[in-house]
From Swiss-Prot:
It comes from Mus musculus. Residues 312-325 are annotated as: Mn 1. Microtubule inner protein (MIP) part of the dynein-decorated doublet microtubules (DMTs) in cilia axoneme, which is required for motile cilia beating. Plays a role in spermatogenesis by enhancing the binding of CREM isoform tau to its coactivator FHL5 and increasing the FHL5-regulated transcriptional activation of CREM isoform tau. Involved in the acrosome reaction and in binding of sperm to the zona pellucida. Plays a role in regulation of the cell cycle by controlling progression through the G2/M phase, possibly by delaying the activation of CDK1 which is required for entry into mitosis. GO terms for molecular function: microtubule binding. Its main location: cytoplasm. The gene is Spag8. Keywords: Cell cycle, Cell projection, Cilium, Cytoplasm, Cytoplasmic vesicle, Cytoskeleton, Differentiation, Fertilization, Flagellum, Nucleus, Spermatogenesis. GO terms for cellular component: acrosomal vesicle; axonemal A tubule inner sheath; axonemal microtubule; cytoplasm; cytosol; male germ cell nucleus; microtubule organizing center; nucleoplasm. It is found in: Cytoplasm; Nucleus; Cytoplasmic vesicle, Secretory vesicle, Acrosome; Cytoplasm, Cytoskeleton, Microtubule organizing center. Residues 1-21, 51-60 have a biased composition (Polar residues). This is Sperm-associated antigen 8. Residues 27-48, 122-175, 303-316 have a biased composition (Low complexity).
């Protein structure tokens, strides 16, 4: 029961503390180790383990805890193995190589076959030992842990900051647990070059290497490309790991400022591209920035008149108007009204001088203008003598036109009634003794001169009226 509880306790704890690369000689906090026998550990002097399944040069895995073997190995169909870097202490390495044990080939594999699955982590312990008796003897150099089991036991004075280590050559109780291997496997003594981290390959990223300038391509004939330039050695691949990386030599300013073409045309037989190849380049650094030339123009544009200066007049400059103060008028209202009055007065004077005065005329038609007929107003004629309206017969429309109508009785006197003339139809015996037609009768109303009203219409007796003496 105690073994099961200790196993569960060891599995629940995680190996979070890893040795630091800056302080390799100082021990770190103790972490429980997965082993079934008491053992002592020593400070680790080598960096932490890294997995073969990941990149050797990855820095993110340095100091990461190692998960259980069944969590990783069963997913890929094989059991992964871990390697560590070669110890830096030659004495400890020689001591460990003298006690090599070829039986263990994996870091998480041990000669002891436990019933439970143990954790492959660092050999750091902080729990009291469940075995019998403390361990003694000199502590060897830190090596990767090569044991795993369900039981976790360690001495009360054991603490280490490197990978889990087996106990050194000291007296231990052989009856409390199996013996563990305390040496590096034969296959891990000489790590291949491809598995060891290549720090020389990272040197090319430490120093910035300026990009080499490209020379303008000059094409002599249409359709012919320039000469082939082989790539420089070492430009495509990293430098060899055996030789240390030296910082590249800084190129001179003339090399950086040398012209580089913007691009190349699709057809190499274009005359314009060949003519402007020298102009299509990056401006030198001493003349200003590249954006300055794009804002203010290019220095070497093609023109038919090389000596002609550039025009200073632009659309934006010509259409620019100075801002005006809207709140404050430029001149007063009295000045504006006086100017308007003077303008109208001067315009009238100039118009009067240029255009002559027109004469007033009456409206007349073409016929009136051609015949020059004078129109007379119609008015009653003036009376020659006074009239008595009581005794005289009034002038009417029929009296004025009585002489023009046929069969009308002749008017002999002014008091002659207006009636039909029946003298022509009267029988002869009845007409005897009667005056003849159109003869004036003698009477009190006989007038020697007929009124002008009777003669106005141009009657028959108007001009030949006979007067008889009284």
């Amino acid at each position: 029961m105690e073994t099961t509880e200790s196993t569960e306790g060891s599995l629940s704890r995680s190996c979070d503390v890893q040795p630091s690369s800056e302080r390799l000689d100082t021990p770190s906090e103790p972490v429980p180790s997965s082993s079934s026998s008491p053992r002592s550990t020593a400070p680790a002097e080598a960096p932490a383990q890294y997995s073969v399944l990941t990149e050797p040069s990855s820095d993110s895995l340095y100091g990461a805890p190692c998960p259980p073997a069944h969590h990783r190995g069963h997913g890929f169909g094989f059991q992964p193995f871990y390697v560590s870097c070669i110890p830096q202490d030659p004495c400890n390495m020689a001591d460990l190589s003298s006690r090599a044990d070829p039986t263990s080939s994996y870091p998480c594999h041990s000669s002891v076959h436990g019933s439970g699955s143990g954790t492959c982590g660092l050999g750091q312990s902080s729990e009291p030992s469940q075995g019998s008796g403390p361990t003694s003897g000199p502590a060897p150099a830190s090596v990767p842990s090569l044991v795993s089991g369900p039981d976790s036991a360690s001495g009360p004075d054991s603490s280490a900051s490197g990978p889990a280590l087996a106990s050194g050559p000291g007296p231990a109780d052989p009856g409390q647990g199996p013996k563990f291997s305390t040496c590096i496997p034969q296959g891990y003594r000489c790590i291949p070059v491809d598995l060891a981290p290549d720090y020389n390959a990272w040197c090319q990223h430490l120093h910035w290497k300026p990009q080499r300038s490209w020379e303008p391509l000059q094409v002599s004939e249409p359709g012919v490309r320039g000469p082939y330039k082989p790539p420089e050695p070492g430009a495509l691949g990293p430098c060899e790991p055996c030789e240390p990386c030296e910082p590249p030599e800084a190129e001179s300013e003339e090399t950086l400022c040398k012209a580089r073409p913007r691009g190349q045309c699709l057809l190499y037989n274009w005359e314009e591209e060949r003519a402007t190849n020298q102009l299509d380049q990056i401006p030198p650094l001493q003349d200003g920035s590249e954006s300055y030339f794009f804002r203010h123009g290019h220095q070497g544009l093609l023109t038919t008149q090389p000596q002609s200066p550039m025009s200073s007049s632009t659309t934006q400059r010509d259409s620019y108007q100075l801002p005006r103060h809207i709140c404050q008028p430029l001149r007063g209202k009295r000045e504006a009204m006086l100017e308007m009055l003077l303008r109208h007065q001067i315009c009238k004077e100039v118009q009067a001088e240029q255009e002559p005065a027109r004469k007033l005329f009456e409206t007349e038609s073409v016929t009136h203008h051609d015949y020059r007929v004078e129109l007379v107003r119609a008015a009653p004629p003036a009376s020659t003598k006074p009239h008595d309206y009581r005794q005289e017969q009034p002038e009417t429309f029929w009296i004025q036109r009585a002489a023009r109508l046929p069969g009308v009785s002749d008017i002999r006197t002014l008091d002659t009634p207006f009636r039909k003339n029946c003298s022509f139809s009267t029988p002869v015996p009845l007409s005897l003794g009667q005056p003849l037609p159109y003869e004036l009768e003698s009477g009190p109303h006989q007038v020697g001169v007929i009124s002008s009203l009777a003669c106005q219409g141009g009657g028959q007796g108007c001009g030949r009226t006979k007067t008889t003496p009284i």
